[in-house]
Amino acid sequence: MRHFDSMEILNELLKFQSITPDDDGAFNYISMILNDFEEINIDKNGVKNVIFRKTFGPGVHICFAGHIDVVKPGIGWDSDPFDPLQKDGFIYARGAQDMKSAVASMICAVSGVQNFNGTISLLLTSDEEGDAVFGTREALKFLQSRGELPDFAVVGEPTCETVFGDTIKVGRRGSINGILRINGIQGHVAYPNKCVNPVHILASKFANFAGHDFDNGNDFFEPSKLVVVDIRGGMQVCNVTPSDVSVMFNVRNSNLTDANDIKNFINDLYKDCDFDLNLKVSSNPFLTDKNSKIVQKLSQSVQKISGVCPVFTTGGGTSDARYFAEFNVDVAEFGVINDRLHAVNERVSVNEVQKLTEIYKDLIENF
């Protein structure tokens, strides 16, 4: 079996225009490299999920996970976003950081395993950047139905902030979206006594609403803050008061706050008003015990290869790691620096990719 270098793999992966949920042939390329692994295809509603798996012994099952899809490149690039350009120690292309670099490192690491007292798998999806409804979660549901869920998982999201090796994600905040609509009575602006202006009602308590912290956070989570993202009301005319005004907001919640806490807060704040509230839980917070074997072993490998002692955090947006937590799989996330995510001229350091590959290899060898 020919050995594939992680940089060679990355260079090829970056050529695929795998905009969600189209893999554009990337899975065929990966299948060619991992041709001695069992391959399980789980396709649903146009989303492709592939599990590559090899069992070496009766021990634990470690799953490396990631996504092959990327967001649209947009305009303004200095080079073709799907024709990787290597320059000054970096590779420029869409998906370089998020997250084909980690996928390439994972493929290289697992393909070279000769001895391991357990099972090694690689779970990849073509829908993480989109709705992610039929992606990683669907693959895990399939494994659960067969009693084959992994014991531990590593997700290759780009976690590092300023220096490679500085951050391991051991959890993520949840995400709750909400729309608050204050109802009033429309009327002529010259006769305010005959109207009920919902904007005035909203404004009277808005300082206590916008930016509200539902908790004080803890060692791993920042406070759960209500962030207003949009306000709409009226007909954009100067002589009619609106019949209602709507506020769209989001709460990235810790494990100390849930949807009921948000509902109770708003019900109390606007208890004397006519309003409607709609809340949607997009994802739940999770936290992997810092003493979990996957966290400790990953931390040791990061320190050994990068020379940096990583901190354990839960910041940033949501990721597919939450689905592993949902299925009670201990999960940690580690990848390259994340300073160009979804940006024009996205790039990744060649040195980081090579070190990331060594970290994944070391984790397997010493688990």
From Swiss-Prot:
Lineage top rank: taxon: Bacteria
Keywords noted in UniProt: Amino-acid biosynthesis, Cobalt, Diaminopimelate biosynthesis, Hydrolase, Lysine biosynthesis, Metal-binding, Zinc
CC cofactor note: Binds 2 Zn(2+) or Co(2+) ions per subunit.
One MF annotation (Gene Ontology) recorded for this entry: metal ion binding
GO BP, sorted A to Z: diaminopimelate biosynthetic process; L-arginine biosynthetic process; lysine biosynthetic process via diaminopimelate
Pathway: Amino-acid biosynthesis; L-lysine biosynthesis via DAP pathway; LL-2,6-diaminopimelate from (S)-tetrahydrodipicolinate (succinylase route): step 3/3
PROSITE patterns linked to this entry: ARGE_DAPE_CPG2_2 (PS00759)
Key word Transferase present: no
CDD domains named among the record's database cross-references: M20_DapE_proteobac (cd03891)
Catalytic reactions of this protein: N-succinyl-(2S,6S)-2,6-diaminopimelate + H2O = (2S,6S)-2,6-diaminopimelate + succinate
The EC number(s) this enzyme carries: 3.5.1.18
Pfam families according to UniProt: M20_dimer (PF07687), Peptidase_M20 (PF01546)
Active-site residues annotated for this sequence: D69, E128 (proton acceptor)
The UniProt record lists the keyword Nucleotidyltransferase: no
CC cofactor: Zn(2+); Co(2+)
InterPro entries, per database record: ArgE/DapE_CS (IPR001261), Bact_exopeptidase_dim_dom (IPR036264), DapE_proteobac (IPR005941), Peptidase_M20 (IPR002933), Peptidase_M20_dimer (IPR011650), Peptidase_M20A (IPR050072)
Positions with a binding annotation for Zn(2+) 2: D98, E129, H342
Residues engaged in binding Zn(2+) 1: H67, D98, E157
Signal peptide annotation: none
Family: Belongs to the peptidase M20A family. DapE subfamily.
Function according to Swiss-Prot or TrEMBL: Catalyzes the hydrolysis of N-succinyl-L,L-diaminopimelic acid (SDAP), forming succinate and LL-2,6-diaminopimelate (DAP), an intermediate involved in the bacterial biosynthesis of lysine and meso-diaminopimelic acid, an essential component of bacterial cell walls.
Subunit text: Homodimer.
The name this protein goes by in its record: Succinyl-diaminopimelate desuccinylase
Organism: Campylobacter hominis (strain ATCC BAA-381 / DSM 21671 / CCUG 45161 / LMG 19568 / NCTC 13146 / CH001A)
